[in-house]
Amino acid sequence: TCYPEFLQDGAQVVRWVKDNIGRFGGDPDKIFLKGHSAGAHIAAMLAIDGRWLRQVGLSPGRDIAGLIGIAGPYDYLPLRDETLKVIFGGADRPETQPIFHVTPGAPPSLLMTGGRDRLVEPGNSVRFAARLTAAGNAVTVKTYACVGHYFIVAAIAPLLRVFVPVLRDVDAFITTTLASPLRIAPLENPVA
């Protein structure tokens, strides 16, 4: 699937969740978008660039409680990989990048990155967090020093949780965000 189809598909998924989560015991007012790598890119675009959710009658600021991005590519132009150029319709299209859609009123965000990630360099999260903060949005960045691109998500598995507290940090972010009447994420290590 190419840009923008995967974002349109993602928006349809969020619409379905909003309409159906109650049947499964969930709360339609407590929807968090979470993804790893390309999934983090999609989650960020849906949470930050309102045009995708508006197409299905939703709004990021109203319908998304928070964004959790794990090793996400948020600011990675120009594209060098030929496959990515095909997927995104060219090497230099800023409209495909979450960082270029940041405005005030975005949902609280938790951005997690591995200090040894060589596929999606940690600067993606740092730059995206700085842009979110500059727009007045709540953001927390967690950098796990000795972790690469794949282990950061593998650490969610029960046997690997002792090595990296990814799941514990996600749980704390969700709990704190939902406890706040303003839905403001904790600013443990804000980015200036």
Please give the residue ranges for each predicted region.
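Primarily recognizes the serine-hydrolase "nucleophile elbow" in alpha/beta-hydrolase
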Residues: 12-82, 94
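Acidic beta-to-alpha connecting loop that harbors the catalytic carboxylate
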Residues: 73, 115-118, 146-148
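Conserved alpha/beta-hydrolase "acid-adjacent" motif
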Residues: 118-127
